[in-house]
Amino acid sequence: QAADDGVDQEGIETGTYPEDISFDQLGYITKDGDISILDVQHTEWSSGDSPFDGCEVTVTGIVTAGDEVYGADGIYAIQSESGPWNGIIFDGWEGAQFTLGDEVTVTGTVEEYDPVWHYRWDNNTKLTNVANSTVNSTGNSVLPVTVTTVNLAQESNVVESYEGCLVTVTNVTVNTLNPYDWGVTDNSGVECLIDDDWADSEAATFLGGLQIGTTIGSVTGIFNFSHGTYKIQVRSMDDITEGMVEIDEEFFQHPYTFVLHSNYPNPFNPETRLRFE
């Protein structure tokens, strides 16, 4: 809590930050040795903000989105190991070169509310102003963690933990065709989103041809938050089990419930979302 001096006003005014400590608190990890991606990403608070927001950190991980994704969306993604909290994205720059499977160490500033691309990246933990980078080795890999669409649903209690991570959902059916992404459900009946912002041309063409009721054996990609929603970013056809794709002619699509969501986290956002289940 802080108070001003009361000069030129009726009295001393005070302010408290964070205003709601059930939503967010101040603090960060202290430890011997290097900070990990998990340290940067993990939070106990529902805001999802990194405890290192605004701090310069150095982390190491294996590239899961390389030059091909940088060419499409201007970012890279790295992950230290399989599982939640272990992935993060960072801004690229002209001349940067990182290949899928490179183990890299990068230094940058943790940013939750991108000052340049607010609506695109706000509430997605990422590294900006990357000052130093080193390729330690090549030819590495990270296994995706298999999750359910419930885990990746917009209102899931664990959805934040998969941000920046390589994930796989299996035996899913296309439930909705949105202007910029697709909703899929597994046996749970709960929808998560898949997207083509990071996809190569072949994968983008495939996704563009999806129909309501299309069933897919598995979808893999990097889970991220952008343009106000969580989604799986498909990279290439290696992320799709295409041999198991078929149309379920008996699939019946209808919303069971709908909710009008507030324009969180930005109340001035002119877009209002109706979410159907």
Protein language model features and the residues they cover:
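Extracellular, beta-strand-rich glycan-interacting domains
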Residues: 1
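Glycine-centered coil/turn sites that cap beta-strands in beta-rich domains
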Residues: 248-264, 268-277
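OB-fold nucleic-acid-binding modules
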Residues: 4-245
